[in-house]
Curated annotation (Swiss-Prot):
<dbReference type="Pfam" id="PF00562">
    <property type="entry name" value="RNA_pol_Rpb2_6"/>
</dbReference>
<dbReference type="InterPro" id="IPR007120">
    <property type="entry name" value="DNA-dir_RNAP_su2_dom"/>
</dbReference>
<comment type="function">
    <text>DNA-dependent RNA polymerase catalyzes the transcription of DNA into RNA using the four ribonucleoside triphosphates as substrates.</text>
</comment>
<comment type="similarity">
    <text>Belongs to the RNA polymerase beta chain family.</text>
</comment>
<dbReference type="Pfam" id="PF04563">
    <property type="entry name" value="RNA_pol_Rpb2_1"/>
</dbReference>
<dbReference type="InterPro" id="IPR037033">
    <property type="entry name" value="DNA-dir_RNAP_su2_hyb_sf"/>
</dbReference>
<dbReference type="Pfam" id="PF10385">
    <property type="entry name" value="RNA_pol_Rpb2_45"/>
</dbReference>
<keyword id="KW-0548">Nucleotidyltransferase</keyword>
<dbReference type="InterPro" id="IPR042107">
    <property type="entry name" value="DNA-dir_RNA_pol_bsu_ext_1_sf"/>
</dbReference>
<keyword id="KW-0240">DNA-directed RNA polymerase</keyword>
<dbReference type="GO" id="GO:0006351">
    <property type="term" value="P:DNA-templated transcription"/>
</dbReference>
<dbReference type="InterPro" id="IPR007644">
    <property type="entry name" value="RNA_pol_bsu_protrusion"/>
</dbReference>
<dbReference type="GO" id="GO:0032549">
    <property type="term" value="F:ribonucleoside binding"/>
</dbReference>
<dbReference type="GO" id="GO:0000428">
    <property type="term" value="C:DNA-directed RNA polymerase complex"/>
</dbReference>
<dbReference type="InterPro" id="IPR007121">
    <property type="entry name" value="RNA_pol_bsu_CS"/>
</dbReference>
<dbReference type="Pfam" id="PF04565">
    <property type="entry name" value="RNA_pol_Rpb2_3"/>
</dbReference>
<dbReference type="InterPro" id="IPR007645">
    <property type="entry name" value="RNA_pol_Rpb2_3"/>
</dbReference>
């Protein structure tokens, strides 16, 4: 079997801490970028890096090409599209987030206006004038590097949609429509845009057509409207049987196969010999047919009765007179045969039908068709589409043509055409976007074939019939909608072009386009607020495919089949990860290796297998292409040459799992984790967990809150590094080089010479994100993991983000767990934790709250942000500066003022006394009321940042200016560093050129003809080096160039500083009526406490019930107390045994770390340590980690980093075996069963049985008790019912529901119940009375009528029933 060999090169972070892998399979191909589906889709939409001539017909280019050229109504002027270009965004992503702007770029389109000479008589008319111009078409949102959009300052993700592919689909009603259970077949042509066309059978086997789900019509009406006569229709759908009249006898041309299954109504003889083949009354069988074929019978004499009741295939006309004797599709009668004989007509053509496989469906439909001509058919369709409107010939023709045959109204799209052609058996995948006559005919023919038992219906849940519509495509559709709105307006204006000398800019109003785009990104169901709790949740959100949304399904109507796992999901869509609840199965996640092809179908990679030998060639297969292949799983046993060893191989074929021989196998899976999504691939020992629990595990990992200090999982799957780097939360080196400078907020890299191209700077400056608020209020903070002087490669991790540790995803903490009951505190999944976890801040998290204060211009005057607030004491203002804004670093609690603000009050009539006092004391403060921003209840924390936005044109306050200064200082610092490095680089090259050269003169004591030495250069100032004159002209020229470079560098730096300064000091574009906005960011520290929700990675979740002092916790014999106690009853019934295996392997990992720490403390030699590490990493003799490539220092750093435990990787479906876990435990000198004797911390007694103890990775989820706890005394009430509102956000009350009423009734607590239902709820009078009574010290209750009873009365009256209360 092939096993994962070591990579030759390790990244900077990887060298510091290797993860020991148990994987047996080699990774044939690297995992593609996890965000590629988003990035590629939008890249194809914009096509910014593609030349105009090379642009593909997709995205913006396709939208413009489909709408332009726009012609005027008269046809004398037209607008043509030439090309487009995107400008530079005004602000970068970080600035857009801070300022609340949309990260977008201006779109300019080159439009050509062509005016024709309307007076000319030529056709086509000559061109009179051409005007070209760049027209601004609004702003197009840009995608960030991590696949998100910044819209109005918040990060959003556009989720891909899984919708029904355009094309044709055949299905049946499963026997539900008709009581007999008969299957009614139907076909539906689904275009990308345009009217749907349905064909369906009714219980009487007639074929009907519906357009856009309207009233059904016989299908022959549609065929007549297409120009087919009855004769043509029968000719298309039926074979004919020809009958000749010879010597008074009827002879039919015999095709023996057509007689099969009929009952002979007369004796059939061989004409030559008279031999009897079939007796009258016997059924004609295959044996009889063989005899007829053998005797080579050409025709058959039939009695006249045999023809009666048969259907004519052609019109019967007397050629001499032109008289119609019968129409096609008429039945043959005695009279008709007589008439034909008398008119001398000797040939009759009949249609061939039988009940088995040549049904008479179209013939029956023709009989119920009321129309007789094309015009009548068109009128009938017009009546169905536009009921009540009087039809005219022109209107009917135009309507029918516009339905399916005009490109503007109908488009199958390339996908639809491909699917359509493949389904109806057309060879080519290309064709027009509109329907043709032949298309409609072929669909009806295929439908009739299926009804006749030839062919199968389609499976609509097959991933070959569902395709993914990604961001780019959805944006393109919205853009097209906007352009079509523009087109209507432009057409009207184009008629004015000749009279007024207008330019393209005057004709086009870009508002509808921007509005459509803005609406899509701002409020579409698929443009969602990004899930940003941790890096995994972001990656998963971008890889999500949803069946909901515009043009998709709705929760209520989606049945079980759509939600279920389908065989085609294998390797394309994860069978595990989907939400619990109403959306289950409708929202899915892409599998790890999945991608979409050019048609939008999901593909999965497979290795090619030739003659039972596996090659390294990888092909991507869609569900359509996969059906006929034999595909083996990736864990098939192979020999060294890649030949399959087993005699029978489990494989997938025709959407079934079966066994087959190796020579039949065409493909093989790439990797065992190919089936699952990113989140599920992070669960170790997933193969030992029940699917329902794995679903919860993958969903709960996305809710893990970033802890104060991230800690890598001891037991992982090897996917952690990939997820962390692709998520974009950590800083990854764009180019290799040397770390020049590093501090907490930025990293400066001096780039390698071979990685800089001309015109690029040789410096990379990475500004780290510090304590930034995520969409879910968690904290985004980056910490550098490199030191000055470190050499790094492109792609190395330079700084860890939230939930990453040394470049690996780290969502939680490794805790020492014991599976045992403890005084009932872990009953029903409760969790018991040690006080040490709280004390060590293992699960302390930082949450950042954004509080906003807005000063508006009101009718009574302007609101003002100030520290001068009426009736507020000095102490309340102690945290504010002179501008009235809180200081950074201030610790605030609920109710504290953050931003002082006063609002003008309406002028009230003053009494004469007040007027006198006002005149004496000049008291003016009473004109304003305090409307300051205060800390909301239940919140306290530290102010970490303040942003002040001032309207353009208003004077900035001192605080706003100081924030600007800080910002400018940061920009200046970056530019100074960049300039320093680039200057050093230039001077280094200058010194290299000058050394040992002969000078002709220069500053200082340099004599002509002397050589230049390093000492001389050290003494002379660097700026004067350029004044040194040299004999060699070529070198002089190079020096001159370097001198110019230095000048240009100075100018460039000044320009960049001024540009940044302009951006920073310009006023802000605020909403109308807003003068100033102050945003205060509070960092709230949340320690773990009872009521918080925790979970493992295997769906084992619970709520903390108690925090126990360390001395009371169960401890081992060496005194180590466990961190957390879980209930063992949570494992067997849930069937997530993965957590137990993880616990054992975690114990081994920690034990190995202890052994390494011991060796380091004993100062053992690097060779001894290397030998021990070799045993750990390459346990089965296969070199997975190449320790030889590390020098002694790197080895010792690695060993030091392993003190806390050796991280293990057990890949999904390819993980550690039980034997391997035992061998690791033994290597760490631990018991092989993973059980330990524990001692009760309170009594000092040993527990009766040994307990499973080990290390498990636990997460703290974003369901914190602080966010949920809530209490209310008085508050707001609902307007109609006057009952208190519900929920924490509305400061609501506790619901006293139906069942609580029953409980009080059962106790007979009548007064308590009355109080609950009246004065504590919606008895408005009683509420105020009881308040007054309590104030007066009188505790009696006087309940009145509950308001909800009055509402009930009003509702009954609304029904027209007079109801009144009788008062005694």
């Amino acid at each position: 079997m092939a096993v994962a060999e070591a990579k030759p090169q390790y990244s900077h972070a990887e060298k510091k801490r290797f993860r020991k892998s148990f994987g047996k399979q080699t990774d044939i191909m690297p995992i593609p970028n996890l965000l590629e589906i988003q990035l590629k889709s939008y890249r194809d939409f914009l096509q910014t890096d593609t030349k105009l001539s090379e642009q593909l017909n997709t995205g913006l280019h396709a939208a413009f090409s489909s709408v332009f050229p726009i012609e005027s109504f008269s046809g004398n002027a037209r607008l043509e599209y030439v090309g487009y270009k995107l400008g530079e965004p005004a602000f970068d992503v970080r600035e857009c987030k801070l300022r609340g702007l949309t990260y977008s770029a201006p779109l300019r389109v080159k439009i050509r206006l062509v005016v024709l000479d309307k007076d000319a008589s030529d056709d086509p008319k000559p061109i009179k004038d051409i005007r070209e111009q760049d027209v601004f078409m609004g702003e197009i949102p840009l995608m960030t590097d991590v696949g998100t959009f910044v819209v109005n300052g918040t990060e959003r993700v556009v989720v891909s949609q899984l919708h029904r592919s355009p094309g044709v689909i055949f299905e049946h009603d499963k026997g539900k429509t008709h009581s007999s259970g008969k299957l009614l077949y139907s076909a539906r042509i689904i275009p990308y845009r345009g009217s749907w066309l349905d064909f369906e059978f009714d219980p009487k086997d007639c074929v009907y057509v519906r357009i856009d789900r309207r009233r059904k019509l016989p299908v022959t009406i549609l065929l007549r409207a297409l120009g087919y006569e009855a004769e043509d229709i029968l000719n298309e759908f039926f074979e004919t049987t020809c009958c000749h009249l010879k010597n008074g006898e009827y002879h039919i041309d015999l095709i023996p196969q057509r007689l099969r299954g009929e009952i002979a109504s007369f004796d059939i003889h061989v004409p030559e010999t008279g031999e009897l083949i079939v007796e009258q009354g016997r059924r004609i069988t295959a044996r009889h047919i063989k005899q007829m074929e053998k005797s080579q019978m050409q025709d058959l004499v039939v009695p006249r009765d045999y023809l009666i009741g048969k259907t004519l295939a052609k019109n019967i006309i007397d050629t001499s007179t032109g008289e119609f004797l019968a129409q096609a599709n008429d039945e043959i009668t005695e009279e008709l045969l007589d008439a034909m004989a008398s008119h001398g007509i000797l040939q009759i053509d009949m249609i061939y039908t039988n009940d088995l496989d040549h049904g008479s469906y179209i013939s029956d439909t023709l009989k119920i068709d009321p129309t007789g001509s094309q015009l009548e058919a068109l009128v009938e369709i017009y009546r169905m589409m536009r009921p009540g409107e009087p039809p005219t010939k022109e209107a009917a023709e135009a309507l029918f043509k516009n339905l399916f045959f005009v490109e503007e109204r109908y488009d199958l799209s390339a996908v639809g055409r491909m699917k359509f052609n493949r389904r109806v058996g057309i060879k080519s995948d290309e064709g027009p976007g509109t329907l043709t006559k032949e298309d409609i005919l072929s669909v009806i023919k295929t439908l009739i074939d299926i009804r006749n038992g030839i062919g199968m219906v389609d499976d609509i849940d097959h991933l070959g019939n569902r395709r993914v519509r990604s961001v780019g495509e959805m944006t393109e559709n919205q853009f097209r909608v906007g352009l079509v709105r523009v087109e209507r307006a432009v057409k009207e204006r184009l008629s004015l072009v000749e009279s007024e000398n207008l330019m393209p800019q005057d004709l086009i109003n870009a508002k509808p386009v921007s509005a459509a785009i803005k609406e899509f990104f701002g409020s579409s169901q698929l443009s969602q607020f990004m899930d940003q709790v941790n890096p995994l949740s972001g990656v998963t959100h971008k890889r999500r495919v949803s069946a909901l949304g515009p043009g998709g399904l709705t929760r209520e109507r989606a049945g079980f089949e759509v939600r279920d796992v389908h065989t085609t999901h294998y390797g394309r869509v994860c069978p595990i990860e989907t939400p619990e609840g109403p959306n289950i199965g409708l929202i899915n996640s892409l599998s790890v290796y999945a991608r979409t092809n050019e048609y939008g179908f999901i593909e999965t990679p497979c290795r090619k297998v030739v003659n039972g030998r596996v090659t390294d060639e990888v092909e991507y297969l869609s569900a359509i292409e996969e059906v006929d292949q034999y595909i083996a799983q990736s864990n098939v046993e192979l020999d060294a040459q890649g030949n399959i060893l087993a005699d029978l191989v489990p494989c997938r074929h025709q959407n079934e799992f079966s066994l087959t021989t190796p020579d039949k196998i065409n493909y093989m899976d790439v990797s065992p984790k190919q089936i699952v999504s990113v989140a599920a691939s992070l669960i170790p020992f997933l193969e030992h967990d029940d699917a329902n629990r794995a679903l919860m595990g993958s969903n709960m990992q996305r809710q893990a809150v970033p802890t104060l200090r991230s800690e890598k999982p001891l037991v992982g799957t090897g996917m952690e590094r990939i997820v962390a780097s692709d998520s974009g939360v950590s800083v990854v080196a764009k180019r290799g080089g040397v770390i020049d400078l590093v501090d907490a907020s930025r990293i400066v890299v001096r780039v390698n010479d071979d990685e800089t191209t001309a015109g690029e700077t040789g410096v990379d400056i990475y500004n780290l994100t510090k304590y930034f608020r995520s969409n879910q209020d968690t904290c985004i903070n980056q910490r550098p993991i490199v030191s000055t002087g470190d050499r790094i490669q492109r792609g190395d991790v330079l700084a860890d983000g939230p939930c990453t540790d040394m470049g690996e995803l780290a969502l939680g903490q490794n805790l020492l767990v014991a599976f045992m009951p403890w005084n009932g505190y872990n009953f029903e999944d409760s969790i018991l934790i040690s006080e040490r976890i709280v004390h060590d801040d293992r699960f302390t998290t930082i949450h950042i709250e954004e509080l906003t204060c807005i000063a508006r211009d009101t009718k009574l005057g302007t609101e003002e942000i100030t520290a001068d607030i009426p009736n507020v004491g000095e102490s309340a203002l102690s945290n504010l500066d002179e501008s009235g804004v809180v200081y950074i670093g201030a610790e605030v609690k609920a109710g504290d003022i953050l931003v002082g603000k006063v609002t003008p009050k309406g002028e009230t009539q003053l009494t004469p006394e007040e007027k006198l006092l006002r005149a004496i004391f000049g008291e003016k403060a009473s004109d304003v009321k305090d409307s300051s921003l205060r800390v909301p209840s239940g919140m306290n924390g530290t102010v970490i940042d303040v942003q002040v936005f001032t309207r353009d044109g208003l004077e900035k306050d001192a605080r706003a200016k100081s924030i600007e200064e800080e910002h400018l200082a940061r920009v200046r610092k970056d530019l100074i560093d960049e300039r320093r490095i680039r200057e050093e680089d230039i001077y280094h090259r200058v010194s290299h050129l000058l050394l040992d050269k002969v000078a002709t003169g220069g500053p200082g004591s340099l004599k002509p003809g002397s050589k230049i030495t390093q000492d001389y250069l050290d003494k002379v100032e660097r700026e004067k080096w350029f004044d040194i004159r040299i004999e060699d002209d070529a070198i002089s020229q190079q020096l001159e160039q370097l001198s110019k470079q230095l000048e240009l560098l100075t100018k460039e730096m000044e320009k960049r500083f001024n540009d940044s300064r302009k951006k920073i000091i310009q006023g802000d574009d605020l909403a109308p009526g807003v003068l100033k906005i102050v945003k205060v960011y509070l960092a709230v520290k949340r320690r773990i406490q009872p009521g918080d929700k925790m979970a493992g990675r295997h769906g084992n979740k619970g709520v903390i019930s108690i925090v126990v002092p360390v001395e009371d916790m169960p401890h081992m014999e060496d005194g180590t107390a466990v961190d957390i106690v879980l209930n063992p009853l949570g494992v067997p019934s849930r069937m997530n045994i993965g957590q137990v295996l993880e616990t054992h392997l975690g114990l081994a990992a920690k034990g190995l770390g202890r052994k390494i720490a011991q060796m380091l403390d004993e100062k053992q030699t690097p060779e001894a340590i290397k030998a021990y590490l070799e045993k750990i990493y390459n346990h089965d003799g296969v070199q997975r980690v190449n320790l030889k490539c590390l020098n002694d220092d790197e080895l010792m750093t690695l060993a030091d980093n392993l003190r806390a435990g050796v991280p293990m990787a057990t890949p999904v479906f390819d993980g550690a075996t039980e034997q391997e876990i035992k061998s690791m435990l033994q290597l760490a000198d631990l018991p092989a069963d993973g059980k330990t004797v524990l001692i009760d911390g309170r009594t000092g007694n040993k527990f009766d049985n040994p307990v499973t103890v080990g290390y498990m990775y636990m997460l703290k989820l974003n369901h914190l008790v602080d966010d949920k706890m809530h209490a209310r005394s008085t508050g707001s009430y609902s307007l109609v019912t006057q009952q208190p509102l519900g929920g924490k956000a509305q400061f609501g009350g506790q619901r006293f529901g139906e069942m609580e009423v029953w409980a009080l009734e059962a106790y007979g607590a009548a007064y308590t119940l009355q109080e609950m239902l009246t004065v504590k709820s919606d008895d408005v009078g009683g509420r105020t009375k009881i308040y007054k009574n309590i104030v007066d010290g009188d505790h009696r209750m006087d309940p009145g009528m509950p308001e909800s009873f009055n509402v009930l009365l009003k509702e009954i009256r609304a029904l027209g029933i007079d109801i009144e209360l009788e008062h005694d």
